[in-house]
Amino acid sequence: MKKLSGIGVSDGMALAKAFLVKTPEFAVNKYLKHQLTKAQAKRLLDSAFKKAVKDLEEIKEITVNNINTEAGMIFDAHIQMLNDPTITEQLEQQLAQNVHPVIAVDTVFSQTATMFSQMQDKYFQERAADILDLRQRLLAYLTGQKPHDLVKIKSDVIIVAHDLTPSQTATLNKKYVKGFLTEIGGRTSHAAIMARSLEIPAVVGIKGITTKVKDGQIVGVDGRKGIAGLDLNSKDTTEWKKQKALEEKYQQELKQYTNKETVTLDGHAVVVAANIGNVKDMELACQYNTNGVGLFRTEFLYMNSQEWPDEETQYQAYKAVLEQAHGDLVIIRTLDIGGDKKLNYYEFPHEDNPFLGYRALRLTLDKQDIFKTQLRALLRAADHGQLGIMFPMVATLDELLQAKQLLNQVHQELGGNKQFKLGIMIEIPAAVLAANTLSHHVDFFSIGTNDLIQYSFAADRMNKNVSYLYQPLNPALLKLIYLTIEGGKVNDIWTGMCGEMAGEPLAIPLLLGLGLKEFSMSASSMFKARMIIAKLNYTECQTLAQKALTLANAKEVEKLVEKFFKKKDIFI
């Protein structure tokens, strides 16, 4: 048997014939010479939009009936994207220049998708797939084709594709579709979320899978290990089925860990919370019984707007999430824009290295009117739940004190009677080294490992040439985390983590042993994290973590934790 590795995004195992999905081609360039009147172009584009909206409403209904309401809301977001003022304005500008609607849609949606795909944050990267899904649907109608949905499959198959759009995934019939394998994608893509909701095993990011599999060939999917099995003989098939039975038993065990409360075997309690980017994400997180929100990224409120969002718009969004949390802490990060996250209505200054430049708190401290508007909306929303306000990208005490001064000023303007917690992101090495001092001025720390790793190892994780340096288990990084937690303890404040590392199974016992109090992650990772923590002894994890700090490299740490898990019969 040949095994191909990718990213497991939906647990489970399956074995069936491959159903190869070809990516539609629209020959966009041939429309460069097509001439339409402006009225004809407008009618053609409007018709395509109406058909697309009708499709999405029908797909939403199918999704709600076959999966759940939360999954269906993904298509509300798609309809909102079609109505996004920024996109419609760009399309109108193209038509005004006598550009054919096919070229206009291809240009605007491709550019928007590229903008998202180039962002550092995986959550934002994977929204590019939603934009391309809409592009594909609109181009199909504009060129007289039918969107390629997969509702007609009537035999047991495993889908093999370059990528699956969210709308394709939503219409899969789990009676027949036993799993899927794709060349691109990630854990927080909407297609991955759909797969988990349908409980269909899936592996994405398998390079060249569509060229290595023939239509009708027997293939295997192992969604937990992130493996595709090809060229299976009878012995391989028997073993795969045996492992599948064990996997099904494991999945049933996972479903026992739905309670919010997460406690180790020796009674040490921690919080497992969700990372979200909008109100709809919170609805999905509630399905996983989240214990509050460890990170609410507010960037989408700004990126989905044609101008700086006003106070009322922001207030309504923050209020909605706080109310859904039913008294659990909701940590809302103030605007973290800049670097790779741009706004259509604001021109950032040119910088040779924007990731080390004018972004996040540095920008909002400079644009105080914008900052105060957000702070007012946040403080007003505090009446509707337990609010945590978090400043991103804090490098120095001076920055923190300046931000606090503005917050206190706005608070006094609103009467000074709002209840909230204040925290900062620890994602710059200088902040780690100043943790003892910074902890005097806040209620909590939240470690942003995605940026902390990049800045500590001087390596852009999106750069394939240096991606090997993205090492969450490196002892040097573990020491930075430990310094942060200990720095917080000096002034009796707790430390959480909202980077991807918080949901990484091999990291969990180490983070627990180092003293992390809150683990914030994508909603789909929470059951597994709770299960792992519930099988651990806090005292043993402390010993394990201290041992890890003495090791030489990430590989040694990985082996240490794997041995620890094996001894305790913990399977991940």
Swiss-Prot record:
Active site residues of this protein: H190 (tele-phosphohistidine intermediate), C498 (proton donor)
Subcellular localization(s) per the UniProt record: Cytoplasm
Enzyme Commission code(s) on record: 2.7.3.9
Any one GO CC term of the record: cytoplasm
Gene Ontology biological process terms, A to Z: phosphoenolpyruvate-dependent sugar phosphotransferase system
Binding partners and assembly: Homodimer.
Record family assignment: Belongs to the PEP-utilizing enzyme family.
Job of this protein: General (non sugar-specific) component of the phosphoenolpyruvate-dependent sugar phosphotransferase system (sugar PTS). This major carbohydrate active-transport system catalyzes the phosphorylation of incoming sugar substrates concomitantly with their translocation across the cell membrane. Enzyme I transfers the phosphoryl group from phosphoenolpyruvate (PEP) to the phosphoryl carrier protein (HPr).
PANTHER family: PHOSPHOENOLPYRUVATE-PROTEIN PHOSPHOTRANSFERASE
Domain notes: The N-terminal domain contains the HPr binding site, the central domain the pyrophosphate/phosphate carrier histidine, and the C-terminal domain the pyruvate binding site.
Note, other: The reaction takes place in three steps, mediated by a phosphocarrier histidine residue located on the surface of the central domain. The two first partial reactions are catalyzed at an active site located on the N-terminal domain, and the third partial reaction is catalyzed at an active site located on the C-terminal domain. For catalytic turnover, the central domain swivels from the concave surface of the N-terminal domain to that of the C-terminal domain.
Protein name stated in the entry: Phosphoenolpyruvate-protein phosphotransferase
Provenance organism: Mycoplasma pneumoniae (strain ATCC 29342 / M129 / Subtype 1) (Mycoplasmoides pneumoniae)
Highest classification ranks of the organism: Bacteria, Bacillati, Mycoplasmatota, Mycoplasmoidales, Mycoplasmoidaceae
Name of the gene: ptsI
